[in-house]
């Protein structure tokens, strides 16, 4: 089994199943395609090519009626209890960094600073030195996502805390059963 992220438009890869994930926080933006908007292809085409369609962040869904969706997904983060007692500097290189930072704020963490990097950023020694300098100046601890932590130079990994996250279905059995139909 091979799972690809952002591969809906990869026509040179044979797929047994395509799963379209709609994030109601990001929405469809202005509904225009790159470079004029956030979409890589029209919503209509993406839905037509997908066997499963998921909605995440349902609490802010304004664009769509959730009756169109087979399963509802939510992204949950797991906060180390030690982080709740510390001043924190969070950094991330995600497609939508603000969502990650907002989730941390909703957990009432003491964020003294957030630092955004481009999606899939490969952290350099200089990046981490600058972050550690900010942490020292603010008497704070660095935290980031699991996705970002693996891209930190090895010698700095122990200096950065990890925020674990997972996407969970409203019905894990249903989710698994639906995917198994195509395997």
Label each PLM-derived region with a short phrase.
Residues 118-121, 158-183:
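Short, flexible loop segments at boundaries between secondary-structure elements
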Residues 1-68:
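Phosphate/Mg2+-binding loops and adjacent switch elements
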Residues 59-65, 98-99, 149-153:
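Short, charged/polar "capping" segments at the starts of alpha-helices
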């Amino acid at each position: 089994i091979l799972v690809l992220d952002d591969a809906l438009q990869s026509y040179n890869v044979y797929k047994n199943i395509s799963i379209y994930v709609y994030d109601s926080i990001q929405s469809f933006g202005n509904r225009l395609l790159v470079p004029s908007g956030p979409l890589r292809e029209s919503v209509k085409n993406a839905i037509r090519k997908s066997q499963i369609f998921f909605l995440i962040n349902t609490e802010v869904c304004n664009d769509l009626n959730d009756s169109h969706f087979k399963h509802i997904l939510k992204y949950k983060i797991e906060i180390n209890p030690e982080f709740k007692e510390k001043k924190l500097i969070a950094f991330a290189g995600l497609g939508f960094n603000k969502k990650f930072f907002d989730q941390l704020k909703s957990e009432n963490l003491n964020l003294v600073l957030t630092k955004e990097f481009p999606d899939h950023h490969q952290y350099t020694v200089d990046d981490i030195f600058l972050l550690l300098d900010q942490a020292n100046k603010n008497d704070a601890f660095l935290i980031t996502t699991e996705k970002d932590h693996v891209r930190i130079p090895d010698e700095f990994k122990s200096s950065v805390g990890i925020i674990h996250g997972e996407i969970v279905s409203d019905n894990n059995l249903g989710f698994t059963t639906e995917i198994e139909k195509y395997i």
